């Protein structure tokens, strides 16, 4: 078995949708990025790639490549899981934390978990997503951006 850790952060801007865990979260701002900027899925993808010593999402999906402009991060995550499968690994579990002062994310977590279970080819009881604030400290606390952390356990098939 292998363990991986992932992290991602994007700034909040007007004129973009807020996509987290593949869910369109109603909010007045969204995350800026080359793709849909889904920090949760990016952190999880990075954790999987790290666990399997396959680099990071910047290596596999560079922001300089126009084919990934506006990309759906769920498709990117499914590609990462296909790479894991080629190496003979499946997901053991994932534990992820979204760091955002606003909006409140608890109502959206069940749908995020369902999306992740589908994309990671895993039972939902192997998927945990939490959301926390920073008590108004730092960039997240000031509402400048949203971050996500993820830890995964990958197991041999």
UniProtKB/Swiss-Prot annotation:
GO biological process, alphabetically ordered: isopentenyl diphosphate biosynthetic process, methylerythritol 4-phosphate pathway; terpenoid biosynthetic process
Function: Involved in the biosynthesis of isopentenyl diphosphate (IPP) and dimethylallyl diphosphate (DMAPP), two major building blocks of isoprenoid compounds. Catalyzes the conversion of 4-diphosphocytidyl-2-C-methyl-D-erythritol 2-phosphate (CDP-ME2P) to 2-C-methyl-D-erythritol 2,4-cyclodiphosphate (ME-CPP) with a corresponding release of cytidine 5-monophosphate (CMP).
Functional pathway: Isoprenoid biosynthesis; isopentenyl diphosphate biosynthesis via DXP pathway; isopentenyl diphosphate from 1-deoxy-D-xylulose 5-phosphate: step 4/6
Binding site for 4-CDP-2-C-methyl-D-erythritol 2-phosphate: 8-10, 34-35, 56-58, 61-65, 132-135, 139, 142
Enzyme class: lyase
Annotated disulfide bonds: none
Positions annotated to bind a divalent metal cation: 8, 10, 42
Cofactor: a divalent metal cation
Pfam families cross-referenced by the UniProt entry: YgbB
Record-listed E.C. numbers: 4.6.1.12
Marked site (Transition state stabilizer) residue numbers: 34, 133
Stated family: Belongs to the IspF family.
Catalytic activity: 4-CDP-2-C-methyl-D-erythritol 2-phosphate = 2-C-methyl-D-erythritol 2,4-cyclic diphosphate + CMP
Cofactor note (record): Binds 1 divalent metal cation per subunit.
PANTHER family: 2-C-METHYL-D-ERYTHRITOL 2,4-CYCLODIPHOSPHATE SYNTHASE, CHLOROPLASTIC
Alphabetized GO MF terms: 2-C-methyl-D-erythritol 2,4-cyclodiphosphate synthase activity; metal ion binding
Protein name per UniProt: 2-C-methyl-D-erythritol 2,4-cyclodiphosphate synthase
Protein keywords: Isoprene biosynthesis, Lyase, Metal-binding
Top-level division of the source organism's lineage: Bacteria
Oligomer and partners: Homotrimer.
